[in-house]
């Protein structure tokens, strides 16, 4: 067993010197274990990951926990292998940290449980599967305009407080109830309270038995926040490759992965690139995203919340992620301010699955007509603001009336928000969604008040709400 000594501590980055000829490999895990000898010292059980070889038999490492109490001269042991974590059935219903240690107070994982390294190559080109199958979410705006692909990568883009985490929680709820497969939730750099709430909600709903969770909260050093994504992905890969399962991987929040990388990048001695991000941003993102894919054995469908700093989509962090995604769901602050939830922008959200050969001709035509109507309404808004509705042609007035009904009908109540809104959530099958919007476009509901279309599920609910108001249907 190779031993070394700590020679420098710079926050989360630690330099370790080894004997000549015994340098550990990149990504190897190193251990520091120290028992306090007096009240001024603290017990230390720290894992480091080798990031750089500096020369002169010295390596630069990233700490996977706080470096409080670490001093120069402490002994370091090379484990001879990368960080590994438990995988398989023993991980379901449990919550782990980046090292695969349980943090849910439910007892230890069996010592003989299989452990896989978190650093692994992406599947080979010939192993990949190329069939396209739609994943129904029960959320109208997504299923109609930016449908998700089974085994695809989906990004939920939005600034602070527009509903990314709530949307992810609703997707977990809907897909777990309808799809019933195995889910992995990787939460990093986000609020501990949200993770705790999510765990207890999943426990109460019974979904937790089919879910493995791994957390690296925002109070932790950048090391665990940077590696938790790989830890969660390793859990998902086992179920895909060894059991042939279709796995759902939820990531909240992808931006924090990049942010943690930029925190340690300068300390590792790298020259920062645009906006202070690490120069290896595209490489790190590619290494993560290329492992999330479908193979002949099974699939991993990943749904990733991605924070957009200051609502700027040209920021390098969200911009680098775009090229890897099959579908994007863009959350718009203006829609949230109008009380339209989920605040998904129907014109900015995209999906490569929105094609007639994949979703069918009727679905495609209805979706495109909805987008055309909303786009025309957007163009007319400046005229309306200056001259008012009276100056519009009869045709444009009709477009505006229908567009407003469509805009409101794209909203719906969520199951996971029921405790806040007091309104029951709704799951709408794709066929019902397409039928509802088709009938609105055909003018079947032009006579109903537009506010009745807000926060409902199926189109029949609009009719019932209008009847309750005394409107003739």
Swiss-Prot record:
Binding site for ATP: 158-165
Transport as UniProt keyword: yes
Subcellular location: Cell membrane
Recorded topology in the membrane: Peripheral membrane protein
SMART domains the UniProt entry points to: AAA
InterPro entries in alphabetical order: AAA+_ATPase, ATP-synt_VA_C, ATP_synth_F1_bsu, ATPase_a/bsu_AS, ATPase_alpha/beta_chains, ATPase_F1/V1/A1_a/bsu_N, ATPase_F1/V1/A1_a/bsu_N_sf, ATPase_F1/V1/A1_a/bsu_nucl-bd
GO molecular function: ATP binding; ATP hydrolysis activity; proton-transporting ATP synthase activity, rotational mechanism
Keyword Endoplasmic reticulum recorded: no
EC number(s) given by UniProt: 7.1.2.2
Chief localisation class: membrane
Regions crossing the membrane: none
Keyword entries, A-Z: ATP synthesis, ATP-binding, Cell membrane, CF(1), Hydrogen ion transport, Ion transport, Membrane, Nucleotide-binding, Translocase, Transport
Family statement drawn from the similarity comment of this UniProt entry: Belongs to the ATPase alpha/beta chains family.
General function of this protein: Produces ATP from ADP in the presence of a proton gradient across the membrane. The catalytic sites are hosted primarily by the beta subunits.
Record's protein name: ATP synthase subunit beta
Organism annotation: Geobacillus stearothermophilus (Bacillus stearothermophilus)
């Amino acid at each position: 067993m190779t031993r070394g000594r700590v020679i420098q501590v710079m926050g989360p980055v630690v330099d370790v010197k080894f004997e000549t000829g015994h340098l550990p490999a990149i990504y190897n895990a190193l251990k520091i274990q120290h028992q306090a000898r007096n009240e001024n010292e603290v017990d230390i059980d720290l894992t480091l990951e080798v990031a750089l070889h500096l020369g002169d038999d010295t390596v630069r490492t990233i700490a996977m926990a706080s470096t409080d109490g670490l001093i120069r001269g402490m002994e370091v042991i090379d484990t001879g292998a990368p960080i590994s974590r438990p995988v398989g059935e023993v991980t379901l219903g449990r919550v782990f940290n980046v090292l695969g240690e349980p943090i849910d107070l439910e007892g230890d994982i069996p010592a003989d449980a299989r452990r896989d390294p978190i650093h692994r190559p992406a599947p080979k080109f010939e192993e990949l599967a190329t069939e396209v199958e739609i994943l129904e979410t029960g959320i109208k705006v997504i299923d109609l305009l930016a449908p998700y692909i089974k085994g695809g990568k989906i990004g939920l883009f939005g600034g602070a407080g527009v509903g990314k985490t709530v949307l992810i929680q609703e997707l977990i709820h809907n897909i777990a109830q309808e799809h019933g497969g195995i889910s992995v939730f990787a939460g990093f750099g986000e609020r501990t309270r949200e993770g705790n709430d999510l765990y207890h909600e999943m426990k109460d709903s019974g979904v937790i038995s089919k879910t493995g969770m791994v957390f690296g909260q925002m109070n932790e050093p950048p090391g665990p926040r940077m590696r938790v994504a790989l830890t969660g992905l390793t859990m998902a890969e086992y179920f895909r490759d060894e059991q042939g399962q279709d796995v759902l991987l939820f990531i909240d929040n992808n931006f924090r992965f990049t942010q943690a990388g930029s925190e340690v990048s300068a300390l590792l001695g790298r020259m920062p690139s645009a906006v202070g991000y690490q120069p290896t941003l595209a490489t790190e993102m590619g290494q993560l995203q290329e492992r999330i894919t479908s193979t002949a054995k099974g699939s991993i469908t990943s749904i990733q919340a991605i924070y957009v700093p200051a609502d700027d989509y040209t920021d390098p962090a969200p911009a680098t992620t775009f090229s890897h995604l099959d579908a994007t769901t863009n959350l718009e602050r203006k829609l949230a301010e109008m009380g339209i939830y989920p605040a998904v922008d129907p014109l900015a959200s995209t999906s490569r699955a929105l094609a007639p050969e994949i979703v069918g001709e009727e679905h495609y035509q209805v979706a495109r007509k909805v987008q055309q109507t909303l786009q025309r309404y957007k163009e007319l808004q400046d005229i309306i603001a200056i001259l008012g509705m009276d100056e519009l042609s009869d045709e444009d007035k009709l477009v505006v009336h229908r567009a407003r009904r469509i805009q409101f009908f794209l909203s719906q109540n969520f199951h996971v928000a029921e405790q806040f809104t007091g309104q029951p959530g709704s799951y709408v099958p794709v066929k019902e969604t397409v039928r509802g919007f088709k009938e609105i476009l055909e003018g079947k509901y032009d006579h109903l008040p537009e506010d009745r279309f807000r926060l409902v599920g199926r189109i029949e609910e609009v009719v019932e709400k209008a009847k309750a108001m005394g409107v003739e249907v």
